UniProtKB/Swiss-Prot annotation:
One GO cellular component, as annotated: extracellular region
Domain notes for this protein: Has the structural arrangement of an alpha-helix connected to antiparallel beta-sheets by disulfide bonds (CS-alpha/beta).
Residues carrying the site annotation Basic residue of the functional dyad: K27
Lineage per the UniProt record: Eukaryota, Metazoa, Ecdysozoa, Arthropoda, Chelicerata
Residue numbers spanned by region Interaction with Ca(2+)-activated K(+) channels: 26-33
Family: Belongs to the short scorpion toxin superfamily. Potassium channel inhibitor family. Alpha-KTx 04 subfamily.
Annotated site residue numbers, Aromatic residue of the functional dyad: Y36
Natural source organism: Tityus discrepans (Venezuelan scorpion)
Identification of the protein by name: Potassium channel toxin alpha-KTx 4.3
Cysteine disulfide links: C7-C28, C13-C33, C17-C35
Primary localization class, coarse: secreted
Keyword annotations from UniProtKB, A to Z: Disulfide bond, Ion channel impairing toxin, Neurotoxin, Potassium channel impairing toxin, Secreted, Toxin
Length: 37
């Protein structure tokens, strides 16, 4: 699941993913966060 959060590194996506999908799992792809559900 891509969320509308800009990133430069995967670490930035973990708290954003936790807030968005309830799971702190994801990575930074093409400057945007991708979360795993």
């Amino acid at each position: 699941v891509f969320i509308n959060v800009k990133c430069t590194g995967s670490k930035q996506c973990l708290p954003a993913c936790k807030a968005a999908v309830g799971k702190a799992a994801g990575k930074c792809m093409n400057g945007k966060c991708k979360c795993y559900t």
